[in-house]
Amino acid sequence: MERIRKEIILMERGLHSPAGKKVSNLSDSAGNAVEEALENSHHSGRLSPRPTSASLHNTVGDTPTNGKFEIDNLFHHQHSSDSTSSSEISSLETRKKFSLYSELACREKEADMNSDVDVGCSTLRSPAGVSTTQLKENTNKVYSDNGSSTNTSSNGSNITNLNGNSSSIGNSGSGPDQVRRYRTAFTREQIGRLEKEFYRENYVSRPRRCELAAALNLPETTIKVWFQNRRMKDKRQRLAMSWPHPADPSFYTYMMTHAAATGSLPYPFHSHVPLHYYPHVGVTAAAAAAAATGATPFPTSIRPLDTFRALSHPYSRPELLCSFRHPGLYQSPHGLNSSAATAAAAAAAAAAASTPAGTAPCSCLSCHSNQSGALGPRSASSDFTCTATAQRSESSFLPYSAAVLSKSAAVSPPDQREESSLTR
């Protein structure tokens, strides 16, 4: 029996032996049955991997009894074909899974690139992370290289997604810190109190800031910032007053107020507004009447007009007002507002024309530089005659300097004011 089986196997491999010729008829019938069984197994193996025993008996039903060894051979071939078909089916399934997961991974990557904000971790919801373990378990050695490349690419995409998520989370976390702070809306009472405190002291101490914060119901930092801005505003106003004498803002305020009172300005002068906000359009009758009656279409300012604390009393240095009394003696500085200088000169001329000669005293430097009793005390009834129209030498004219302007005098009524010593 063993010898016949070996001869049949050798005959199938192509080695014809004399023993094989004796059983040629048997081998032909067995070979045909084996070929038909193999063909049927190849065609039906993809649909039904393991054929039933009834189909095998039907296939080999016509073989004689002494040829039962072909059944074992047939089962051997059937098992081999079954293993090959199962491996093909598993390879096809892995191919389909691989293509499906690769497409899903590509779509997920495109969705992540197109989406603005990523919510959650991308590795938990991307199928590429799940497909890595399944591909390692199911793929054969043929797809090992492809699987490793796809794993590395998917891991790289996961890493980039994680970096993107962390950056987006960081941006969202730093967003509330970058909220724009809106400006504080102060009431009139708060601004008036702060302005009053600023006139008293430009730099406020911290305990005083705490008191103001409690009184005005404002944060301490808001009051601190307000004082900083107010100091800068005051500095800008002082720098903007380039005419006529920026070293003495009280003199500037007095001159402009006097010009507004005489009618040279079409509306009342506010000392806290810089000079270039007042375009001089000339003196009109309506403006003069409005200045005389005090009626003005403009509302009163929130804070008082004595910004430099100079309007509460007449000017403390009357010896410097010769430019108002005699505008021809003082030329306007170069590069300054010529229209303002012209308007001030016109106002001074109008004031001089309206005042009779000899009735109002003139105490300017040029008028009293040659007077013998200029430095001594004078009474309210003693008046000096102005010598501005008289002939004077160049040496007798003494213009005031910055050192003279920086000096301050005591506040007193005009009739009780004493002449202060002047240095040339």
Curated annotation (Swiss-Prot):
This is Homeobox even-skipped homolog protein 2. It comes from the Eukaryota. Its main location: nucleus. Residues 179-238 bind DNA. SMART domains: HOX. The keyword DNA-binding applies. Residues 18-65, 132-178 are annotated as: Disordered. It comes from Heterodontus francisci. It holds the Pfam family Homeodomain. InterPro entries: Even-skipped_HD, HD, HD_metazoa, Homeobox_CS, Homeodomain-like_sf. It is found in: Nucleus. Residues 146-175 have a biased composition (Low complexity). Residues 50-65, 132-145 have a biased composition (Polar residues). Keywords: Developmental protein, DNA-binding, Homeobox, Nucleus. The keyword Transcription does not apply. GO terms for molecular function: DNA-binding transcription factor activity, RNA polymerase II-specific; RNA polymerase II cis-regulatory region sequence-specific DNA binding. One of its GO terms (cellular component) is nucleus. Belongs to the even-skipped homeobox family.
